[in-house]
Each structure stands twice: as structure tokens, then as C-alpha cells.
């Protein structure tokens, strides 16, 4: 699970209305495949604002190594969150719930088989898998899809090259 300071920054940032600046939106969409743009647009305004910042930091950190698939990975790493339909306060409850259950995959899977708010919490906690599935269906580069699936895993479980994963992770937890 993300560090407390990262979660606090994301929470307070999500309270600010609006998405990224128009220039950042235009830049972000220029980094995405046509099939990825609808996924980007389905993300919440705060998630898009956060993701644009992550991608800009990745671009600065990696320079020429920040290829289109790497920047798409930065922009779409949280795309699975949109499947839950939870707002800011629901996400807070989901994050706390995930911590309480130790992110037990069997409990999370059971929650996704229910209805209403509990199902949405389960979906939110599965956002890495759901995001990877969405990106796979969109025909995203394997690196982009893998990072969505792996961005909450320990480094020794990443399949993306370590230098790229470290830059993506550092930019997200900045």
C-alpha cells in the first residue's frame, strides 16, 4: 500500500476541482494511442491531473528513455479506478478497508461478487488488474499494460525494466 504522505497528498489534491490544464491534457492525449484516449477521458478529473503530473515527472527523469509506452504507463497506471465509480470519500473508505483486510485477495474477490458499495470497494481494490485488462483490450503496449497491473507490487515482482519501473514509481509517490 502507498505511504501515508502519498495518500494524504492524493486526498487533498482530489478535493481541488477540475482536471489538468488544457495544455497538459493536449500533451497527455498526444502520448496515447487513439484506443487509450477514451480510457484517459473516463478517469476522474483529479486522477487525470495526478497522472499528467506523474507523466511529466517521468519525462524529466528519463529523458529519451521516456518513450510513448512509458509515458502512457504513467498516464494510465490508475485507469482501473474508474471502474469502481467511487468518489473521493468512497475511495478513502476503500483504501482503509483494504488495509484492514490486509488486501486479502479472497475477501476482495468476494466483495466484487456482491452489490452496491461493497462491490465498488472490491472493484477499487482491484484497480491494477482491471486497469491492465482495460489496457490489454485497448491494444496498449505490453509495458503500459504491465505497469498498470504491477504499480502496487514490490519491485522484485515487476516485469518492466527496473530503471523504468523505478522512475515511474518515484514519480507516482513524489
Task: Locate each region found by the language model.
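Divalent metal-dependent catalytic cores for phosphoryl transfer on phosphate-bearing substrates
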Residues: 37-50, 55-174
